[in-house]
Regions:
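Solvent-exposed interaction patches of small proteins and small membrane subunits
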Residues: 1-111
């Protein structure tokens, strides 16, 4: 039986990304605090799906992933040419970590 986990996760990612895009097409500065927190939550959820899709796809293609972490997966995905720019992904990891571990309204607005 063919492993379709990466395809199922990719479909979930596409749905999550569409919801994030919908939110980002609005004027973020007009959002109330709860709405802003919802957008950040959508970003975090979408990013989690994104790096896990990369991991699942690379494993499906036979790549050996020694370390299962977002940074390790992104670096391998870049080396294996699954993504064109690791820096953008690494910044997203930093943004996600910043929002997960701190609360600073200025940083919140910047992300």
């Amino acid at each position: 039986m063919e492993d379709i986990r990466w395809q199922q996760r990719f479909q979930n990612f596409q749905r999550a990304f569409a919801l994030l895009r919908e939110a980002m097409e609005q004027d973020f500065h007009q959002f109330n605090q709860l709405e802003k927190e919802g957008v950040i939550q959508r970003f975090e959820f979408t990013f989690e799906l994104a790096w896990k899709v990369l991991k699942d796809k690379m494993e499906h293609d036979g790549l050996i992933i020694d370390q299962i972490s977002p940074r390790a997966v992104v670096r391998l995905a870049f080396q294996a040419k699954y993504i064109p720019d690791a820096e953008v992904w690494l910044r997203m990891i930093g943004d996600r970590n910043l929002m997960s571990h701190t609360y600073d309204s200025a940083k919140f607005e910047a992300v």
